[in-house]
Amino acid sequence: MAKAKFERSKPHVNIGTIGHVDHGKTTLTAAITTVLAQKGGASATKYDEIDKAPEEKERGITINTSHVEYETANRHYAHVDCPGHADYVKNMITGAAQMDGAILVVSAADGPMPQTREHILLASRVGVQYIVVFLNKADQVDDPELIELVEMEVRELLNEYGFPGDDTPIVVGSALEVLENQDNAEKTKCIDELMEAIDSYIPTPERATDQPFLMPVEDVFTITGRGTVATGRVERGVLHTGDEVELIGMKEEITKTVCTGIEMFRKILDEAMAGDNIGALLRGIQRDEIQRGQVLAKPGSITPHKKFVGQVYVLKKEEGGRHTPFFNGYRPQFYFRTTDVTGSINLPEGVEMVMPGDHIDMAVELITPVAMHENLRFAIREGGRTVGSGVVTTISE
């Protein structure tokens, strides 16, 4: 059967399955594609196809992830599923697969388990704001009161990590039963309910072009008689000729200037938007006032900081990371957007050292300020090689 062409007219949302090992994340992913395929909104993907996830390299870190896509009447979804727990940790911290929302899969037969808790914590740390719960394996539970009990436990757990547990949609069903009874509407109903909950509860993310303008400066050069040009890829928002912008980072003070011209592929543009690689001509800026590592941004939209707390995954030796642990006061480089800045690390109380393969919260103080916001990703490097990957969880000052 010919594959239906995906219409890009629908809003796009990135989601993924999270939860404890063997609670049925991959089976559920297969069940969703199977049910939606019958409505023409997906191509059915079998369990084994999802389970043998290809290895991906993201910033040098090996992550196994499966990507499937499907659509409901209202939206187009890209869905990630990871086979192993370690893959989830890496995925969420590196932002390899950005999630706008998550489906937390909990086995109704077992209730919340250690990784259930850990994935909820990770989701809250890396800025996944919306979780919909699927209580799986309901066919293995005869007593409805047990299911209610598990539901209460899950809601309490979500509340504990700052999610609105009492308002979170919880759908009860059995993904395996769905796969075994594809033509039985009664058995597949739980998938319809789940997709309805996701459609209505997880909001459509703000498009990059609707956010305030920001462009990391990659290179700087002077055009005789015209002035200084900063080049880079617009990360978010839109820039128009004549817009006021701020130059932020690498020094304490913020420089205000005006963009007097935009070039792309040697053509003059009136505006540039998220994703464009451009050169921006800046009024009254000297060549030595601007450098790689700074950002051009809409005035007031982002500020420079030196101190922050980050959630970090430390690469294993096999991933090209360190062979030995590091201790308090370790001073690597922190790579933000386009540049390395040296910083020193403070480990949490009671933590003596960090081993390759660990993930940990750490307080960092940089030697020069960087334009940053919460959920910004960074890499930790030593002599040009990546030894860790992290996300800013809180800005300290």
Curated annotation (Swiss-Prot):
Residues 60-64 are annotated as: G2. Mg(2+) binds at residue 26. Residues 81-84 are annotated as: G3. Residues 19-26 are annotated as: G1. Keywords: Cytoplasm, Elongation factor, GTP-binding, Hydrolase, Magnesium, Metal-binding, Nucleotide-binding, Protein biosynthesis. It is an enzyme of class 3 (hydrolase). GO terms for cellular component: cytoplasm. Residues 174-176 are annotated as: G5. It comes from the Bacteria. Residues 136-139 are annotated as: G4. The keyword S-adenosyl-L-methionine does not apply. InterPro entries: EF-Tu_GTP-bd (IPR041709), EF-Tu_GTPase (IPR050055), EFTu-like_2 (IPR004161), EFTU_2 (IPR033720), G_TR_CS (IPR031157), P-loop_NTPase (IPR027417), Small_GTP-bd (IPR005225), T_Tr_GTP-bd_dom (IPR000795). SUPFAM superfamilies: EF-Tu/eEF-1alpha/eIF2-gamma C-terminal domain (SSF50465), P-loop containing nucleoside triphosphate hydrolases (SSF52540), Translation proteins (SSF50447). GTP binds at residues 19-26, 81-85, 136-139. It is found in: Cytoplasm. GO terms for molecular function: GTP binding; GTPase activity; translation elongation factor activity. Its EC number is 3.6.5.3. Monomer. GTP hydrolase that promotes the GTP-dependent binding of aminoacyl-tRNA to the A-site of ribosomes during protein biosynthesis. HAMAP family: EF_Tu_B. This is Elongation factor Tu. It comes from Clostridium botulinum (strain Loch Maree / Type A3). The lineage of its organism: Bacteria, Bacillati, Bacillota, Clostridia, Eubacteriales. The gene is tuf1.
